[in-house]
Amino acid sequence: MELSTCFAYGSLMWPDIMTRVCGREVSALQHTQAWLHGHARHPVRGQDYPGLVPQSGAQALQGVLYTGLTPQDFQRLDAFEGQEYERVPVEVVLEHPATTDGLAPAGAAPAARQKTWVYRYRPEFEYRLEPGDWSPQAFEAQGKARFCARYVGFTQTPAP
């Protein structure tokens, strides 16, 4: 599937982290708020980042949709996410300016939808997921500095 978009729901929601991972300034990339339905975001045991798993009836997850990613960006993202994650296509709901969950208010035109890639936690690693929801606010307040210190050296470009 030829997509140049990626929905970030964890550490990659922060453009400075996405810049480090992609190895180039991503401020030129268009990024907007988006929501993913039918999935849950759980903390990974012993880590500051989350794992995403399908879950029917789950509350919509807010994240960031990056547009304009290159094949080289995806090579680096694939290497960064590693064996615990698989890149899969999903559909996200783009931000509707009148709401906080991306859905259109009654009587308004429906919010736009977009097909995109997301990195989902592989089923064989789900035993590492903790119960509860991963908190972006807690990550920013407590985990981001630790995460950046741990992964600041990520500069490898995988072989083609």
State each model region's role.
Residues M1-P160:
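Glycine-aromatic micro-motifs
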